[in-house]
Regions:
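Extracytoplasmic beta-strand/coil segments of soluble accessory domains associated
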Residues: 41, 50, 66-103
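N-terminal periplasmic accessory domains that precede
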Residues: 65-68, 83, 93, 109-110, ...
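Short acidic/polar hinge/loop motifs at secondary-structure boundaries
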Residues: 99-126
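Face-selective signature of the C-terminal outer-membrane beta-barrel domain
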Residues: 228-249, 268-420, 436, 501, ...
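Outer-membrane beta-barrel signature, preferentially recognizing the C-terminal barrel domain
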Residues: 272-274, 326, 376, 380-382, ...
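Surface-exposed extracellular loop regions of Gram-negative outer-membrane beta-barrel proteins
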Residues: 301-303, 357-359, 364, 411, ...
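Gram-negative outer-membrane beta-barrel transporters
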Residues: 499, 503-507, 525-610
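C-terminal beta-signal and adjacent terminal beta-strands/loops
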Residues: 631-686
């Protein structure tokens, strides 16, 4: 599959198609389907659930189930945080009422492999529903597949062609066989990785000696070969789902500042080998009682090399070299029992046990001379257990309540250059209320305690030689805690239209950010308490009534404001790596008679800052444009072209000579003109 490392990705604007069909979703229950252009009808018994049948997506002529899900109004797919464990770390996509058997085989990946003609209907579940595991999300989709027998192959070819940088090519082949409740598939993939922020520019450094203006250029690309096998079928009165995958992946990047005799060059290469096995078994144990068990194991071996060399007046300085080699793994055992006590009340309880490990050896040299790093060679292990209970109660057709409690205990042990052992215990309550006072109006409230998971790589040293920065490891990390209060109002109109406004406040305990270490180094660590306030707005306007047939207008943005006390200066500042704003404005259209869709999305402003003890690094982008056109001459063939334009990307770095006084040693301004690139994709089903 194709992986794209986009600075603009957080906007989630990779458009799979264009406007909605001029129909409204059909409700669950024995109600008549709505006429074209009418507002969606709610299930008379459960107003938080809307059902979208294939007719709703007909004008789009979707290729895959993911194309259909991407067009569900009011929903944005999320594959989860990828954090350790299963509970609270997976996505908001269910297939036949359950999540995929593996964490790495994300919901969007499964749907992208599922042909659209295999979808019976899609349920949009807002605020919870009996028998549905929301996993902390306010909104999820449940894709229900058709039964029957079939054999199908899907082949894809894709390319990313850059104006002056490294081009990449990939493709995949999948065979799927289905016979009633039993199915199996094989996927062979030659994937690609790219970055949209590379290109030429200028790098200007200002210090006490004056101004140095130099040329700048960079590039980054990668790919991977993988094979995956999936199976699903009945077993011993229940259903078994299994998946296994093995892959080889690589990433290359380089950066040049200056030219000729005055040149700073850095590069980075990473090679990984990874695999996983996932098993899910679901079985009724008595009327209204269901047992669900999961076993997941995944592993990775990695080898990384980063180098840097500065040449001044034709004389090379001491070469920098940072290497990291190691392995990581995760094993999860999870079981729960679900009791559908009544049609309005579902209770479930269970537990999860997980073991995680990272074993890495790292080294840093300058001119061939080893430089000692804190926690350069470490092994980090975590044994974590969690017990949970939750319930969903549909008080009446207009009101649904969901509540639960998770009790987590974990022990993290570190050995190697530094030894440490810490144990943690946290109670994580959750409450959500969903009120639908009348059709097309919904109010959702959520209160929850979330616990962030520690990134094992933060326990070990690391380097970013493109800006001459080396980080030490930190053995004293503790999880970040958030008390979240969130209120969302949703209003649907014109059948496919929606306006959603949400406000969220996080009280953050033990914020994880950059902190100072002795010896002039810095590391990732806990820097104190902080807050986040977020205003979210999501708008979809169908344009048929405005004489733009098959068209729609979209707007989506999160405005974030964060506060934390800087551990170096003692002053209030934003939390690192949180984007204050990133509006996504788009127009798309289906032209059925031409069997074509087109669209354009614009991000007027994006960016974020990283605040360290010795430097502040901020990047800003403006005027990011992505446009596409997709032609489907037959139901089994699609041709898609996408153009990405971005000519305004700047990085500002302020470096200090003294942590206490914050005296500026120099500033660096990098103005990059990211290269334009075209993405091509051909998909054929046979």
């Amino acid at each position: 599959m194709t992986k794209t490392m986009l600075l603009a990705t957080a906007a989630a604007f990779l458009m799979s198609g264009a406007a909605f069909a001029a129909q409204a979703p059909a409700p669950t229950g024995p109600t008549a389907p709505p006429l074209s252009g009418q507002a969606p009808l709610d299930d008379a018994a459960q107003k938080g659930v809307l059902v979208f049948t294939p007719d709703f997506f007909a004008a789009q002529r979707p290729n895959t189930a993911l194309d259909m899900v991407d067009r569900v109004p009011g929903f944005s797919s999320d594959d989860g945080s990828g954090a350790r464990g299963f509970e609270g770390a997976v996505g908001n996509i269910l297939i036949n009422g359950n999540r995929p058997a593996s964490k790495n085989d994300a919901g969007t990946d499964v749907l992208e492999r599922t042909p659209a003609d295999k979808v019976d209907h899609i349920e949009l579940i807002r605020g919870g529903a009996p028998g549905i595991d929301m996993q902390g999300y306010s909104v999820v989709v449940n894709v229900i597949l058709k039964q029957g027998s079939s054999r199908q192959s899907v082949a894809t070819w894709n390319a990313a062609l850059f104006d002056g940088n490294h081009d990449v090519y990939g493709g995949s082949y999948q065979f799927t066989a289905k016979d009633g409740e039993r199915s199996w598939s094989v996927l062979l993939s030659d994937g690609t990785s790219t970055s949209d922020s590379n290109g030429p520019g200028r790098d200007v450094i200002r210090d006490a000696n004056g101004v140095r203006d130099q040329a700048f250029a960079n590039d980054g690309w990668g790919g991977g070969d993988s094979a995956r096998v999936n199976y699903s079928g009945p077993l011993a009165g229940g259903k078994l789902e299994a998946t296994a995958q093995y892959g080889l992946h690589d990433w290359h990047e380089w950066q040049d500042v200056g030219a000729g005799p005055d040149l700073d060059h850095s590069d980075y290469v990473e090679d990984t080998k990874s695999g996983e096995l996932g098993l899910t078994y679901i079985r009724p144990i008595k009327p209204k009682w269901t047992l669900e068990t999961r076993v997941i194991h995944q592993f990775e071996h990695f080898d990384e090399v980063a180098t840097g060399l500065q040449t001044v007046g034709g004389v090379a300085g001491d070469a920098q070299r940072f290497t990291a080699k190691g392995k990581s793994s995760e094993s999860i055992l999870r079981a729960l029992v679900r009791h559908e006590r009544t049609s309005a009340l579902t209770l479930e309880a269970g537990g999860e046990l997980a073991y995680n490990m990272l074993d890495t050896d790292q080294a840093y040299t300058e001119g061939g001379t080893p430089i000692a790093l804190p926690s350069a060679s470490v092994k980090v292990e975590e044994l974590r257990g969690e017990a949970f209970a939750k319930g969903t109660w549909r008080v009446d057709p207009k009101l649904t309540l969901e509540g639960g409690l998770r009790l987590e205990t974990s022990t993290i042990k570190q050995s190697g250059d530094a030894s440490a052992k810490e144990s943690f215990f946290y109670a994580k309550p959750r409450f959500q209320a969903t009120w639908t006072p009348k059709a097309n109006h919904q109010l959702r409230f959520r209160f929850e305690r979330e616990l962030g998971q520690l990134d094992f790589s933060d326990f070990a040293a690391s380097a970013e030689l493109d800006d001459n920065t080396v980080y030490g490891g930190n053995v004293d990390l503790a999880p970040e805690q958030r008390w979240i209060s969130e209120l969302t109002f949703e209003r649907r109109f014109w059948g496919e239209g929606i306006v959603s406004v949400g406000y969220r406040h996080d009280k953050i305990i033990d914020v994880i950010d950059r902190l100072p270490l002795p010896g002039g180094l810095s590391a990732t660590g806990n820097i104190g308490n902080g807050t986040l306030d977020r205003l979210s707005l999501n708008i979809v306007v169908p344009l048929d009534r405005l004489r733009f047939p098959g068209g729609r207008f979209t707007f989506k943005n999160d405005w974030n404001e964060t506060h934390v006390t800087d551990p170096t200066t003692g002053k209030d500042r934003p939390i690192s790596d949180v984007r204050p704003t990133q509006a996504n404005i788009g127009v798309q259209q289906d032209i059925a008679r031409w069997k074509t869709q087109w669209g354009i999305n614009w991000l007027p402003l994006l960016g974020q800052g990283t605040y360290g003890p010795d430097q502040i690094n901020t990047w800003r982008g403006a005027g990011y444009v992505e446009s596409f056109v997709e032609y489907k001459p037959t139901p089994t063939l699609s041709l898609r072209a996408q153009l990405n334009l971005w000519d305004d990307f700047t990085i500002h770095r302020e470096v200090y000579s003294n942590r206490a006084t914050r005296a500026v040693l120099y500033t660096e301004d990098r103005d990059i003109n990211p290269v334009t690139f075209v993405s091509l994709k051909v998909r054929k089903t046979f």
